[in-house]
Swiss-Prot record:
One Gene Ontology CC term in the entry: plasma membrane
Organism of origin: Saccharolobus islandicus (strain Y.N.15.51 / Yellowstone #2) (Sulfolobus islandicus)
Family: Belongs to the ATPase alpha/beta chains family.
PANTHER family membership: H(+)-TRANSPORTING TWO-SECTOR ATPASE (PTHR43607:SF1), V-TYPE PROTON ATPASE CATALYTIC SUBUNIT A (PTHR43607)
Signal peptide region: none
Protein name: A-type ATP synthase subunit A
Amino acid sequence: MNNGRIVRINGPLVVADNMKNAQMYEVVEVGEPRLIGEITRIEGDRAFIQVYEDTSGIKPNEPVYRTGAPLSIELGPGLIGKIFDGLQRPLDSIKELTKSPFIARGIKVPSVDRKTKWHFIPKVKKGDKIEGGDIIGIVNETPLVEHRILVPPYVHGTLKEIVAEGDYTVEDPIAVVDMNGDEVPIRLMQRWPVRIPRPFREKLEPTEPLLTGTRVLDTIFPIAKGGTAAIPGPFGSGKTVTLQSLAKWSAAKIVIYVGCGERGNEMTDELRQFPSLKDPWTGRPLLERTILVANTSNMPVAAREASIYVGITMAEYFRDQGYDTLLVADSTSRWAEALRDLGGRMEEMPAEEGFPSYLPSRLAEYYERAGRVKTVGKPERFGSVTVASAVSPPGGDFTEPVTSQTLRFVKVFWPLDVSLAQARHYPAINWLQGFSAYVDLVANWWNTNVDPKWREMRDMMVRTLIREDELRQIVRLVGPESLAEKDKLVLETARLIKEAFLKQNAYDDIDAFSSPQKQARVMRLIYLFNTHASRLVERGIPTKKIVDSMGQLLPEIIRSKAAIKNDELNKYDELERKLISVFENLEKEAGT
């Protein structure tokens, strides 16, 4: 394979000639330090290479070494609990090797530890017919994750050999497949190109909600397992904290957190918190189900794109094992800015605000890899990849290209409002601008498993919030006294919804995570208040009298979110009894 020669260097873009027969997206090693790069354009025998490491110090005429392979990652036991850079190099291994807090250029470190032995339990026997995606055995990687060893998608045939139960490294052959006369070894580890989606048998409709423990996300704008969501918001509106809450408390089996071009201290927060936090679904440390990809703002710009693809490829791998995975990306705007930077250096025709014209297709490729699927292989299983991405529009302008294009491809929109954040209303998700296309799909699950009136109660809350916004303009002009009594009740109910339900403290031990049952109990109290109070208002009782009769009951309902634990829901029975008792007394008064 002929090596190329550098002719031009422009930041992360390197142009090399003598690259005849090179392939698009082929990985090359650039210059004497052998920096990792990827071919993004070919003109004759000249290749344009985006380099994923700092190019300072390399010179024209230095060699470019071809590998003949696309950018691929290693998939196997040893991924869980690790933190990787944007090229899937484990940061702890780099630190041990270099004895430095910085990543040395051109360093080569295996993504999956070659020395660790894993206890392999075979699930197939010699002579079995196997195909791509079949589970041939398991490795208990962590107490939370049973790592299912899959036949690579392109392998099929008769199982000629399979090892006995025992301890093996990721490079040891554990099986041999007779594939049309060729003997193909299977190891615990496999490689997969990051830009190619992993195959599946069938894409399914997402009908089960991905529970997050955040009330506004679960109830007002729910996301389904296999769904796509965007969280746009200006600086300081709470994007990172919202995404961290998602990563901490979501009911996903595997969480992959990609820090793409954001500040390094945010990744540090994750690493400090996750080992000490317990998964509310299993009681185990959160790091036992989490993979972190750190491609922070001070790392090379070009590697931001790689980090996004690395994250979603790992998510697809665990999906193929039959797991529900969540990919959290913070933030896709930084990736888009990297595309803009590289597009400018390659002298491409810019589109709106300087972003490349292919930005929508790149975003579409990324979001289309989400979904709930029936996987290939035996036994039959179902898995999902849910994608939640932050978008960082400058100045909170949602009409800028990255936000507006993202809106075309996502089904859930969680817009963060800086005015809510300034008013200390967190999560600062604007209930008027947001939307979810999954409400109808997940309503049946909520009605069946949590509360048969869930949809009715949710719709009442949404209607009340919309009506309150309409009334706010009138209140500003003439004051609340001029409103009809039923409209005064709308304002009171909306206040209760916001204070008791929508506001949530991500740093409170009790309030940080609300179980579906607890959410339904709080909704039920608000629903009862609104229903009974509406009847009394129709009978001529003023809203002020109803609120005054409540005494300390409404503040008690508001405080309950941080006072009543998820396993103490019987305490809501007492609040319900008190609420109904107040209304019964008011109805007796109204009847006389």
